[in-house]
Amino acid sequence: MLKFENVSYSYPGSDAALENINFEIKEGEQVGLIGANGAGKSTLMKAALGLITAQGNITACGLPMTQSNLPQIRRKLGFVLQNSDNQMFMPTVYEDMIFGPMNYGLSAEEAEQLTDETLALLGLSHLKHRHNHKMSGGEKRMAAIAVTLAMKPELMLMDEPSSSLDPKNRRILINTLKKLPVTKIIASHDLDMILEICDRVILVDCGKIAADGPAGEILRNKELLEAHSLELPFCLAGPVGV
């Protein structure tokens, strides 16, 4: 599904942002990508999307990450941005959702059917004709996920999907992501969400993989997390003294 082999990348005039990254994500896995600010998570996501040209070998959805393969690869990948305003650019949710499928050759009727099916799956049918500027932040985040799913991606990459959400909308987001069968990579500082959704965690620090394994093991390892400037998820931290 996604494989990195000895992948490295440096921004001009700076140290390595990624250094000898190796991992393989298989179909159906739910992977949390964690690390402190500046650890390399965003750069890794950019490499997975083909937005930067890294050294080493990247294979996505069975295709080598080459310039000639990028159009095919990007049709198989879905990316949910941290800021939904940068993703929702049409007047209504419906228009956003049919835009991609129709560009890929579906008829208006087929695109609308796909839109209706996707919104029903997510319990968001009430948002179909909602104007984007009249939605709350949580509604817009959920709509952005629906727009991405309407493209029928084989692999979804998500950047801080729970950021800035109130508790109610965060819970709706988590419940939605848990029931989506598509393979997912979720980059987030929300370790409680990662623990609840993901079965595997990749911990990145200083552009290197510091740990890669079962989410429950890594996120319960207080010494490991603190060594890489992270803390236990709140649900595992216990009572806080006053």
Where are these regions (language model features)?
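H-loop/switch region of ABC-family ATPase nucleotide-binding domains
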Residues: S188-H189
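Conserved ABC ATPase "signature" region
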Residues: E109-L127
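Conserved beta-strand-loop-alpha-helix hinge in the C-terminal portion
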Residues: K208-E231
